[in-house]
Curated annotation (Swiss-Prot):
Swiss-Prot/TrEMBL keywords: Cell membrane, Germination, Membrane, Transmembrane, Transmembrane helix, Transport
Compartments, as annotated in UniProt: Cell membrane
Gene Ontology CC terms: plasma membrane
Gene giving rise to this polypeptide: gerKB
Upper lineage: Bacteria, Bacillati, Bacillota, Bacilli, Bacillales
Protein name: Spore germination protein KB
Family: Belongs to the amino acid-polyamine-organocation (APC) superfamily. Spore germination protein (SGP) (TC 2.A.3.9) family.
Pfam families: Spore_permease
Length: 373
């Protein structure tokens, strides 16, 4: 797994699929009401800054794993502690994403099936993919990205043709001022989905060419932000803001409204395929980061074997994380962003970025002085 190589194009596709993932299931920026789409765009702008930090650290240490460059910046003991905390973070978020998609399948397809069965089936596929390595995941992302794009385009056309879009549901814009939007940005959308790209610090070392990481990564994030904002705006324009916020899965509720010429309806099950693809990749990448982080920290010679215990742990956590879906959503919206995402996505990476840039300048200065001698 650690010797695998992926292209910058594959990274581009993986970022888009990862970003869309579970963010299309719910309503990002829900605290902003009918202005949620604005909160998504502003959150994306901050997400671009966060990605700049993440790739900036990598560019300072292009040939090192996160554990190795934290050793250089923090010392062995602190590096070990923070590496371990990030492993727990990746595993925890993987469990939350797995729970999201398990609940979706229970709601729309498998009403009487225990959630542990549904989650277990999803996790088995992710474990298999992670054991095959990041190269296989990247190639699968390239292949399935086209299917997601096609399904999304068909869905947009059908919604327009069905005549269910009412732009008036998006008005008045900023009726309550900018404050609710900014509150939503700094408590929701800057973290999910955009700050979640912190995971890619575990994937950057696998790139075969690092010169276009910043450009391609930011383009991928901008595209993702536009797609998520458009999806939120369509949900609100079709369902109205009240129903959008009450719906557990507003995109699928929007798809259910499609009815063309009395024969084309109930397409939500069909479009669940696109969502499941996104969910599979998101869970798989979080599992991959957990496995790679654990193998690096504990010097495991056969990292792929860790996919089994890590996957089982994430599966169990996804069931025990909340007693019901309402509690799960409440924690995800009100607790996780400020108490979990904030330190792992912003505070600690910002500190590492400052230290990395400072150390890089010191190294360059030292080399310059030696050259003069």
């Amino acid at each position: 797994m650690e010797k695998a190589r992926i292209s910058i194009r594959q990274l581009f596709v993986m970022i888009i699929i990862f970003e869309l993932g579970s963010s299309l299931l719910i309503t990002p920026g829900s605290m902003a009401g009918r202005d949620a789409w604005i909160a998504v765009l502003l959150g994306c702008a901050i997400g671009l800054f966060l990605f700049y930090l993440y790739q900036g650290i990598y560019q300072c240490y292009p040939n090192s794993s996160p554990k190795e460059y934290m050793d250089d910046m923090l010392g062995t003991k602190l590096s070990w502690l923070f590496s371990f905390l990030y492993i727990l973070y990746f595993a925890y978020i993987a469990a939350r994403v797995l729970r999201d998609f398990g609940e979706m399948l229970l709601t729309f397809a498998y009403h009487d099936t225990p959630i542990i069965i549904v989650n277990a089936l999803l996790m088995v596929v992710s474990i298999y993919a992670v054991r095959k390595g990041i190269e296989v995941l990247a190639r699968a992302a390239e292949l399935l990205f086209g299917a997601m794009y096609l399904l999304g385009a068909i869905g947009l056309v059908l919604i327009i043709v069905s005549g269910t879009i009412d732009p008036h549901n998006l008005k008045p814009v900023l009726a309550n001022g900018i404050s609710p939007v900014l509150h939503s940005v700094f408590t929701q959308t800057m973290y999910v989905p955009f700050g979640e790209v912190v995971l890619f610090v575990m994937i950057f070392p696998n790139l075969n060419d690092r010169k276009d990481v910043k450009k391609m990564g930011m383009i991928a994030m901008a595209i993702s932000g536009l797609i998520v904002a458009l999806t939120v705006a369509i949900n609100i324009s079709v369902l109205d803001v009240d129903l959008t916020l009450r719906s557990q899965f507003p995109l699928l509720s929007t798809i259910q409204t499609i009815k063309v010429e009395e024969f084309l309806d109930r397409l939500d099950v069909f479009f669940m395929l696109a969502l499941i693809i996104g969910g599979f990749f998101k869970v798989s990448l979080y599992l991959y980061a957990t496995v790679v982080g654990t193998s690096t920290l504990f010097k495991e010679k056969n990292p792929s074997q860790l996919a089994y215990p890590m996957g089982l742990g994430i599966l169990i956590l996804s069931i025990t994380i909340a007693t019901n879906f309402s509690e799960h959503l409440n924690e995800g919206l009100n607790v996780v962003p400020l108490y979990i995402h904030l330190p792992f996505q912003l505070l600690f990476p910002l500190f590492l970025f400052i230290v990395a840039v400072w150390k890089k300048k010191r190294r360059e200065k030292s080399k310059g002085e030696e050259a003069k001698k």
